[in-house]
Amino acid sequence: MAAMRSSREPRSDAARNHEALVRAATGAVHREGPRVPMATIAADAGVGIGTLYRHFPSREDLLDYLTHVSFEQVLDNAQAAERGATTAAEALRRFIEAAISQRNELVLPLHGGPPLRSPKTRAIREQIHQILRQIIDRGRADGTIRQNVTPREIVVFGAMLAQPRGPDPDWDMTCRRLLATYLAGLAVPTPP
């Protein structure tokens, strides 16, 4: 009987509750960290604690889910940046700008989220690093990216700029200026 239920589409109220829980949990983790009380998340979502535990049987399940969907989004960003850019520097700029614009939607280890436990999520992280390696290699080959740049450095810098915050146009502008400075620093220096 349970197998039949899992093959059907979720009821519309269950889907709405799931979406509300994910939004509330993301906001609560950004506000209070990964140890935020589960009751706070349920209250923020406007559902009872039982509904929360039906969707996510444990805190770890919830945090793993949030982290996994965040890494899926970052992977989508990396793929789009690689496809849509004509230069390596442009691809890196697009990748990091996407993270900045989504900063309040992502729950990642470098944003105070939990360490990665899921092999599937670790595999997505590796795909992201592989795409960034390809972008960096392209820039090395055409002489526009320094030889010593690593995917990890790109990810860490992007995560620093994409820290969750409330709306602040000045911060967005500051992030974009810092990004431009960073990308200029990645470039191979022109000889005197």
Regions found by a protein language model. Give the residues of each.
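Amphipathic alpha-helical interaction segments
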Residues: 20, 40, 90-98, 153-157, ...
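C-terminal peripheral helix-coil segments that are non-catalytic and often amphipathic
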Residues: 1-5, 94, 130-145, 167-192
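Short secondary-structure transition hinges
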Residues: 61, 97-134, 159-168
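Short hydrophobic/aromatic patch on the recognition helix
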Residues: 46-56
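Helix-turn-helix/winged-helix DNA-binding modules
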Residues: 33-34, 54, 146
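Alpha-helical DNA-contacting segments of helix-turn-helix folds
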Residues: 29, 56, 63-70, 106
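Basic, helix-initiating cap at the start of DNA-binding domains
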Residues: 1-35, 39-44, 61-64
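Hydrophobic alpha-helical connector segments
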Residues: 65, 72-105, 117-120
